[in-house]
Amino acid sequence: FRMYLQNVKKSSENTILSYLRDLRGFCGFMEGLGVCEVSKINRTNIMAYVYELQNQHKASTTIFRNLASIRAFFYFLMGQGVVKENPAVDLELPREERKVPKIMTLEQVEKLLEQPKTSDAKGLRDKAMLEVLYATGIRVSELVSLHVDDVNLPFEYIRCTTGSKSRMIPIGTKAKEALWEYLKKGRVQLIHNPEETVLFLNYGGKKMTRQGFWKIVKNYAEEAGIPGEITPHGRVIIRTS
C-alpha cells in the first residue's frame, strides 16, 4: 500500500505516514471487533470506528482524514483483487449536535425541537423527524422517503438513498432516542398495513408528504414564537420589519 501511495498516487511522505498511521489505528480496532480479514470488513464496522473516534473527541478534520485513508486503502485492495467493493464509499459525518444554524438562535432551535408532545403517536413521529432532520441535514424529500430498514439504531446511522446512490449518515444520540421512541410507541399506532415499510407515516398509514411535513414544522415554529417563515426549501427567513 505504501508503494501504491508513493508510485501511483504520488503522495508526499507526510501524507503516506498519516495514511499508514490511520490504518494502523483502524486495523487495531477491527481486530478488537474480531474482524481479522479485510474482505470481512463492512460499512457497519467502519461506522463503528467513526463513532469510536468521535467518542475520543477527535476533530472532524481528523475523522475525515481517517475515512480518506480507509477509502484509499480499499481502492488499493480492489485494484489487487482482494475485495470487490469499497465499503468506505459515501460515508458521511454528522453535524455536531445542537450546532446553531446561522439564521436561528440556540434558544429558537431548542424551542422548535421541544414543541412536539411525545404523549401521542403524532408527537413521537414529529419529534423523530425534527431530530433526524436537524442531526443529519438531509433534504426533506429524503427524510420522508426513509424506510424502516434504513435505520440502524445500534450503530446510530441511517441509510439515505437518492436515485441509485446510497450513503450512510450518523444520527447521534438525540435522534437515535427519538427514533427509538417513535418505532416502539408511535409508528405502531399509525400503521394500517403491516407490510408498509415507509418509516414516517401520516394518519392514513401512508408516506408523509414533503408539503405535509413543512406545514407541521410551520405550526411548531409559530407555537414556539420563532419569527420568520418556514419555506418548502427548508430555510427560516428572518423578518427585518
Task: Give, region by region, the residue ranges found by the protein language model.
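Conserved catalytic core of the tyrosine transesterase superfamily
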Residues: 1-241
